[in-house]
Amino acid sequence: MIKVFRTSEMYLIAAEAGAHLGGEKLTQGNKYLNDFCKKRYSGYTEKTYPTASQLISQVLLERKREFIGEGMLWSDLRRTHQGFQRESTFDIDEEYNKINNIMFKYGMNLKYDADDYRFVWPIPKDEIDANPQLKGQQNPGY
């Protein structure tokens, strides 16, 4: 499968890299983020994030907006060692809840700490069976 990289992703990667490298690269990271935002928001006014953590926070926010529904957030949370919590705001019918308890018990309110084992997928059994070097190995928690 070919992974398609959009120009917007490259701008955000460059902005975050500049923040991590610091110094002159922090200035360059701000430029990449401003260039990205100018193309997304009409009337955008350039901003300067003076610290790496501020710039990274803004880049991650833009990544959430830009790549919604594309499966990027999971990787970002893992890469930046962040957990997440999602709480349901749905009004749940108690009778329906009795019928479909699994969904409402396990699917509506979620909390994963940053080091939760579920951030790493299990190694598929077929792969373990096909590769003798993987015999007896599995990612923690599975």
Give residue ranges: language-model regions.
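Acidic/polar-rich alpha-helix caps and helix-coil junctions
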Residues: M1-Y142
